[in-house]
Amino acid sequence: MKHFQSKVLTAAILAALSGSAMADNPPPSTDEIAKAALVNSYNNTQDINGFKVGDTIYDINGNGKITRKTATEDDVKADDFGGLGLKEVLAQHDQSLADLTGTVDENSEALVKTAEVVNDISADVKANTAAIGENKAAIAKKADQTALDAVSEKVTANETAIGKKANSADVYTKAEVYTKQESDNRFVKIGDRIGNLNTTANGLETRLADAEKSVADHGTRLASAEKSITEHGTRLNGLDRTVSDLRKETRQGLAEQAALSGLFQPYNVGRFNVTAAVGGYKSESAVAIGTGFRFTENFAAKAGVAVGTSSGSSAAYHVGVNYEW
């Protein structure tokens, strides 16, 4: 049995009033009603502020008997709020909402930074692509077949000239004849030029292979960055939905509280009243209905319930007593 159910008290008061109005049995005494109402007020205060093991609580059975007891760990666990109280629950709710908002902001900043990294990688890829184009153009220019053919023609011409110089029939003076050393030197220079061209071509091929490898590496990094952006986007969407749900629940609760605060309590002794009110907060609205009874000039009780007008909203209720002196 949970500590003092406010709904049970309300039902007991209304049943007692209805029974006294419809039957000959005498209604409960003012002291009994006042005692039950004061106990209810005490427990409602605990519902708002919370209670812990060792605090004093009250139980009421089906016959309306009220028993005072010391709260145990089972009583705290059986409480709707776990002994925290409505104030603490609302404070935790507000803190959770603030934490989620901060997380959304952090993920947004991380997403912006990731986008900057992707832009930098894209710029590097474009630069490498341009460098590959330049290398290909340089290779085409250095290894141009026309240049090689020109070298070959020069080699052929030199061989012909050497053969002509060495022809005894054409020799007039010793100064006009190439020596063996001169001929060997000319062949060595030509061979060096051909070797240099081959070295240049090989170097350009190596640079081209390195550039292609760099492009492949950048492609892998770009794919990884795109995957990271997708994951961050998914998380951000989930956080947006969570924040939206919390915002909706908070606005619904405030609208229901506004509606409950508009309910009236009875003014005339011995009069029973029914009251209704509407309330709203930003885009949410709620409707509340309530009832009350003034027992004496000094003592009155009332109860009310509110429901939001939008789909998926939960109900809120209150039970209160008033004692004047």
Swiss-Prot record:
An antigenic bacterial cell surface protein that adheres to and induces bacterial uptake by human epithelial cells. Residues 232-270 are annotated as: Outer membrane translocation of the passenger domain. The keyword Transport applies. About 50% of hypervirulent serogroup B N.meningitidis encode this protein. Several alleles exist that vary in length, this is allele 5, which is not cross-reactive with all antibodies against alleles 1, 2, or 3. Homotrimer. Keywords: Cell outer membrane, Coiled coil, Membrane, Signal, Transmembrane, Transmembrane beta strand, Transport, Virulence. This is Neisseria adhesin A. It is found in: Cell surface; Cell outer membrane. It comes from Neisseria meningitidis serogroup B. The chain crosses the membrane at residues 270-280, 284-295, 302-308, 314-325. One of its GO terms (cellular component) is cell outer membrane.
